């Protein structure tokens, strides 16, 4: 994992694999990933013109930060408003499909943070879209913390390539096909190596469902991630639909 992905701009990086090994064998993928993605609105994704949100993260004693994002999935345009790695304010817009022509700050700090924050915000979609990741339904297990049971679906990324190769996201999926809890296991040596977090605070913006509240621990330290100011703009409209 590149150094920029460790605690980029004081952020908390749990990046999915983007640059994947060439010609890997087809992974085993449970149909539950599609069911989960449909619950979150993946069938209406083509209607989404833009998404905006603020990713707020805190690990007690390590950092507290807020990143404001606006993303146009169809064009690849990303706009960021927040601190750089030294805490200085940054405001920048760029084309995420043309990273080679961007500044080092965008390539090494802003884009890795965007990937991290976007995975927290939309992981049910990314887990479905990332076809190189394996996913096998393990059946019902007790939740890692608290009462209750859910379907355990580990989403494992290939060992080669990406920001954090070999990462595993253990999703705990409820009867309604919503993620209720997850455990993140880093494939590399950089901390944090293990994260436990709830998936609660569900809100809907247009056709897209978001989990906005995540509490747990990162290597034993208290963790709080929450997604605020979520809104979606649909194709053909200038109106932002706030999550409720």
Question: What residues fall within each predicted segment?
Answer:
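Gly/Pro-enriched, hydrophobic low-complexity segments
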Residues: 21, 146-243
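Flexible, processing/modification-adjacent segments and terminal tails
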Residues: 23-34, 94-167, 187-193, 243-244
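Bacterial N-terminal signal peptides that target proteins for export
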Residues: 1-10
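Short amphipathic beta-strand/extended segments with alternating polar/hydrophobic composition
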Residues: 66-71, 89-97, 106-116, 195-198, ...
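Hydrophobic h-region of N-terminal signal peptides that target proteins for export
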Residues: 12-21
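Tryptophan-centric aromatic hotspots in well-structured domains and transmembrane helices
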Residues: 45, 69-73, 120-121, 169, ...
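N-terminal mature ectodomain segment of secretory-pathway/periplasmic proteins
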Residues: 31-105, 133-142
């Amino acid at each position: 994992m590149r150094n920029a992905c460790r605690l980029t701009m004081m952020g908390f990086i749990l990046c999915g694999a983007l640059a994947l090994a060439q010609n890997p064998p087809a992974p085993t993928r449970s149909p539950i990933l599609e069911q989960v993605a449909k619950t979150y609105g993946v069938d209406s994704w083509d209607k989404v013109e833009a998404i905006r949100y603020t990713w707020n993260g805190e690990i007690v004693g390590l950092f507290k930060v807020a990143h404001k994002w606006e993303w146009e999935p169809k064009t690849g345009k990303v706009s960021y408003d927040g601190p750089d790695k030294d805490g200085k304010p940054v405001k920048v817009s760029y084309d995420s499909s043309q990273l080679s022509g961007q500044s080092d700050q965008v390539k090494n700090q802003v884009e890795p943070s965007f990937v991290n924050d976007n995975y927290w915000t939309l992981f049910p979609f990314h887990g479905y879209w990332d076809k190189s990741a394996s996913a096998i339904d393990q059946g019902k297990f007790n939740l890692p913390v608290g009462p209750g049971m859910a379907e355990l679906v580990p989403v494992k990324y290939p060992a080669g390539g990406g920001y954090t190769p070999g990462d595993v996201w253990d999703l705990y999926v409820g009867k309604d096909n919503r993620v209720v809890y997850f455990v993140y296991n880093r494939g590399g040596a950089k901390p944090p190596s293990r994260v436990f977090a709830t998936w609660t605070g569900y809100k809907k913006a247009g056709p897209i469902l978001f989990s906005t509240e995540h509490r747990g621990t990162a290597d034993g330290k208290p963790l709080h991630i929450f997604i605020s100011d979520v809104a979606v703009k649909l194709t053909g409209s200038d109106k932002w639909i706030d999550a409720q």
